[in-house]
Swiss-Prot record:
<comment type="pathway">
    <text>Cell wall biogenesis; peptidoglycan biosynthesis.</text>
</comment>
<dbReference type="GO" id="GO:0009252">
    <property type="term" value="P:peptidoglycan biosynthetic process"/>
</dbReference>
<keyword id="KW-0963">Cytoplasm</keyword>
<feature type="modified residue" description="2-(S-cysteinyl)pyruvic acid O-phosphothioketal">
    <location>
        <position position="121"/>
    </location>
</feature>
<feature type="binding site">
    <location>
        <begin position="126"/>
        <end position="130"/>
    </location>
    <ligand>
        <name>UDP-N-acetyl-alpha-D-glucosamine</name>
    </ligand>
</feature>
<feature type="active site" description="Proton donor">
    <location>
        <position position="121"/>
    </location>
</feature>
<dbReference type="GO" id="GO:0051301">
    <property type="term" value="P:cell division"/>
</dbReference>
<protein>
    <recommendedName>
        <fullName>UDP-N-acetylglucosamine 1-carboxyvinyltransferase</fullName>
        <ecNumber>2.5.1.7</ecNumber>
    </recommendedName>
</protein>
<dbReference type="Pfam" id="PF00275">
    <property type="entry name" value="EPSP_synthase"/>
</dbReference>
<comment type="similarity">
    <text>Belongs to the EPSP synthase family. MurA subfamily.</text>
</comment>
<keyword id="KW-0573">Peptidoglycan synthesis</keyword>
<dbReference type="GO" id="GO:0019277">
    <property type="term" value="P:UDP-N-acetylgalactosamine biosynthetic process"/>
</dbReference>
<keyword id="KW-0808">Transferase</keyword>
<keyword id="KW-0961">Cell wall biogenesis/degradation</keyword>
<keyword id="KW-0670">Pyruvate</keyword>
<dbReference type="InterPro" id="IPR001986">
    <property type="entry name" value="Enolpyruvate_Tfrase_dom"/>
</dbReference>
<dbReference type="InterPro" id="IPR050068">
    <property type="entry name" value="MurA_subfamily"/>
</dbReference>
Length: 447
């Protein structure tokens, strides 16, 4: 059992936050850029890498391929001059969905790849059929048997061929997988209906910094002209827009004034628009700094999650927590993933009034939330419970921290620095009360 598995978060809510928080590097950029480093036969230095369980796991996957990888603070160095095996380890890939995306880079480098089907958060079906069909269009033979995806490029050269590929849906993972595969392919690849997320653009910029020929990233049509090889690079990834959004929502629900640095406001346009819509004031202090001011009244609103540049599905759960205390009735429609509203029942344990029908949540605002024991069911659901706990009267105890640690870089420490009364306790919930009573009181938590 890991530390996160045996830990709980205890939050004494009802306290405003104050101060400054620096946003970490983007989780979803870090994972795929680490996979992208497999395209390069030289040294890749990746900066601004967040300290996350998922990043550690991705490093284990890459190391298992025989690739040299070292980490110091927020810098990861990868040298894939020699990839000793094309077979990724089952026990690691099945725990981390993003590790499957490395199949494009491995296939491009070696002409063969064996990748178990992916794991990650249990938030509905996220098949890899778009990845497979795209690789097949580029000349790969792909078979899936017993949960293992086997791919190879027939012929003596073992090089993928450029192709025109239309994605049925703008899948981020498929766009990234096929873009990586195309960087070393023979000829031109055109991805139509491609994902437009900032992390896709970040991966494209990383590959371009290594010498790839990519145009159109950030639009629905991406054109890649394959090159024979890529060279060494020193690259810094973008800030995490979902972490930034989570702290903005935490500030809003606690009626706080906080400042966020290392952000890209352009990546937060749909979220900022919704926050302003419900009465929150957000000021752009500088090109990479935002300040949120307390709202007198939070108003209800409706949300439809959409692929970028729409409202991000990863902010749906945190924003639902915020709307539990808004005046009036809100409707949240989750249109990106099914089975991503399980946090509603846990928020109701805290006194929220949420009714779920299919992929739609109906949220009726309540005057206050009350602390209670709750369980995080996935990464963003866990963040929603933290946000609700910050506003709830009394103590909230959150289990399931292994989800939270997959995607947030020391969120409890950052919240403590903003004045939150929050503790991570390395004991089962039944014993946590004793530990807190014996060792620390809410008033003595460092702020």
């Amino acid at each position: 059992m890991t530390e996160a598995d045996s830990s709980v978060l205890q939050i004494w809510g009802g306290h405003p936050l104050q101060g400054h928080v620096k946003i970490s590097g983007a989780k979803n950029s870090a994972l795929v850029i680490m996979a992208g480093a497999l395209l390069c036969s030289g040294d890749c230095r990746i900066r601004n890498v967040p300290l996350l369980a998922d990043v550690e796991r991705m490093g284990e996957v890459i190391s298992a391929l025989g690739v040299r990888l070292t980490r110091q603070a927020d810098i990861i160095d990868i040298n894939a001059s020699e990839i000793k095996t094309s077979k990724a380890p089952y026990e690691l890939v099945t725990q981390l969905r993003a590790s499957f995306f490395a199949i494009g880079a491995i296939l491009a480098r070696l002409g063969v790849a064996q990748m178990p089907l992916p794991g990650g958060c249990a938030i509905g079906a996220r098949p890899v059929d778009l990845h497979v069909r795209g690789l097949q269009a580029m000349g790969a033979e792909v078979q899936i048997e017993h949960g293992i995806c086997n791919a190879y490029v027939p012929g003596s050269g073992g090089r993928l061929k450029g192709a025109k590929i239309y994605l049925d849906t703008p899948s981020v993972g498929a766009t990234e997988t096929l873009m990586m595969a195309a960087t070393l392919a023979d000829g031109e690849t055109i991805l139509e209906n491609a994902a437009r997320e900032p992390e896709v653009v970040d991966l494209a910029n990383f590959c371009k910094a290594m010498g790839a020929n990519i145009q159109g990233a950030g639009t629905s049509t991406i054109t890649i002209v394959g090159v024979p090889k890529l060279h060494s690079v020193d690259y810094s990834i973008i800030p995490d827009r979902i972490e930034a959004g989570t702290f903005l929502v935490a500030g809003a629900i606690t009626r706080s004034e906080i400042t966020l640095s290392s952000v890209v406001p352009e990546h937060l346009i749909p979220l900022i628009a919704k926050l302003r819509d419900i009465g929150v004031t957000i000021i752009e202090e500088s090109p990479d700094c935002l300040r949120i001011l307390p709202a007198e009244i939070l108003k209800a609103t409706d949300i439809d999650t959409l692929p970028h540049p729409g409202f991000p599905t990863d902010m749906q759960a945190p924003f639902m927590a915020l709307l539990t205390l808004a005046e009036g009735d809100s409707i949240i429609n989750e249109s990106v993933f099914e089975n991503r509203l399980r946090h509603a029942s846990e928020l109701n344990r805290l006194g929220a009034d949420i009714r779920v029908k299919g992929n739609t949540a109906f949220v009726r605002g309540v005057p206050l939330l009350s602390g209670a024991p709750v369980i995080g069911t996935d990464l963003r659901a866990s963040a929603a419970l933290v946000i609700a706990g910050l506003a709830a009267e009394g103590k909230t105890t959150i289990q399931g921290l292994h989800h939270l640690d997959r995607g947030y870089d020391q969120i409890d420490v950052k919240l403590q620095q903003l004045g939150a009364k929050i503790l991570r306790v390395r004991e089962e919930p039944a014993n946590a009360e004793v530990a807190v009573n014996n060792n620390v009181s809410p008033a003595s938590i460092s702020t």
